[in-house]
Amino acid sequence: MERIATVTRTTKETDIAITLNLDGTGKADLSTGIGFFDHMLDGFARHGFFDLECKVKGDLQVDGHHTVEDTGIVFGEAIKKAVGDKKGINRYGYFILPMDEVLALCAVDLSGRPYLNFECEFTVPKVGELDTELVKEFFYAVSYSAMMNLHIKQLAGSNDHHIIEAAFKAFAKALDEATQYDSRLSGQVLSTKGSL
């Protein structure tokens, strides 16, 4: 069964189309209008072995907030749709990723209960054209749209570029683990409830 989802969303502020393949090879075709954001999404795709197409037209003449937040909403919806009924998958995933002086932790639970715990400290307002405060907004939107429990924590380091990049890559690795099949589940959902 292919685990591919395409989700579109159009508002007065943004026009977004995302296609996500959970069982890809790490290919990305990205155009958000924010170069550093594209770079982060490319890292996510490559390190999680997801194929990701993300086309965004946003009101960047205002600022990047709507573009980044709305991309997170659509991205989360694509994850939820691609994951499907969650039968046979690990459900949980975690990764601790080093990037030079930075160490980032990410843990994911595809529980159907949205929650974000984001503990990263930034020292500059922007990296490239991406407002650093929007990194949390992106992950918040992803977690709530995907209905996932998501923890991202900076364990060490101070370079904002490295912190953000490590967070995106750790998220990719954790989500890859959470979406992998475990044959011991025999197609069942990993929950005492029988469903998620």
Predicted feature residues:
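N-terminal intrinsically disordered, cationic/polar leader segments
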Residues: M1-L196
